[in-house]
Amino acid sequence: MKKILVIVYPEMNDVEYTNVMVVFSFIKTIQTTCYHHSLKKITASNGVVEVNNIVNTINLSEFDAVYIPGGIGATKHLDKDEKLLKTINYFKVNNLYLFAICDTPNVLFKHGIITKDEIYSSFPNPNLVMSENRSTAKVTVANKLITARSAGCALEFATVIVCTFLKDNTLNELVHKRLFGSEIKD
């Protein structure tokens, strides 16, 4: 069983959270835990999603990866939350998987969690400093750092995560079948 810590915070993007979590739920060897150090309930940016299965205390050594949704909340809340940033940095420092989408990679770059030498995808936010190595690709895999550009890439991002994280490309077909009800056609 692989365990993924899911960092949640106010105004995270609904689509980025739900699409990725749905794909994770397809894979029986993945277990997710939603975490925030103090909040018990989170409402996402569009008010569509409310997360209330949040734990406030964790043992980081129990997790194999961390997933951080993006959205406006990344720049408004995550950017200023030293406890969450420290939690995310634990995964980087310990060479564990880190999955981030939209503005979250920009925030992680700002705080030095993503370095100037790493290639990553993110939302092209003109209000944030971005690395020269920022990619315009929808999804980027750079060793154990997997990033995506925006909510529109969330399903592809989630599929790349499960295939890369579990080192099993056949999961691509399983995810596609669960999402679209059919085999992948050329």
Swiss-Prot record:
SUPFAM superfamilies: Class I glutamine amidotransferase-like (SSF52317). Gene3D superfamilies: 3.40.50.880. Coiled coil: none annotated. GO terms for cellular component: cytoplasm. InterPro entries: Class_I_gatase-like (IPR029062), DJ-1/PfpI (IPR002818), Prot/Nucl_acid_deglycase (IPR050325). It holds the Pfam family DJ-1_PfpI. It comes from the Bacteria. CDD domains: GATase1_DJ-1. This is Uncharacterized protein MG029.
